[in-house]
Amino acid sequence: LEETSDKAVIFAVFQTDIQQLEKAIAEKFGEGSVASYYGKTPQDERQRIIDKFQDPESELRYFISNPQTGGRGITLTEAGTMIFYSNSYDLELRVQAEDRIHRIGQDKSCTYIDLVSENTVDEKILQNLLSKVKISNEVLGEIRNWFK
């Protein structure tokens, strides 16, 4: 996180991970530098968090969420970096999550980082996701060929 000069979105699958990440980031960078956005985030606070994160002048630099809650339907283009602390096996959730920072209006290049250790379930999940991407690309390529 210290190496990112811009804002960052961090996705974690489990609530305990989100809570621990928020605590650690707040201790290192200050309370106002981080916000979490997940199932336990009150509905009336959610838009305020997004608006504050999207404000270039805001001290809020780190937006932590899970893909189920923060991975769809919101724009987070103030971030140029997205970190996947953990993943699920759901490729659609992953693709949707990536698109939160890679949208119309994004003028920065986007960097995606997966935190994965060798010989862990996280490595197997990432391999599974990459396999699904390959299959999806092959199927879509075949469909496109039908219309040529």
Task: Label each residue range with its predicted role.
Residues 18-22, 46-47, 61-109:
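SF2 helicase motor core recognition
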Residues 7, 33, 109-111:
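Residues at the starts of beta-strands that form the adenosine-phosphate
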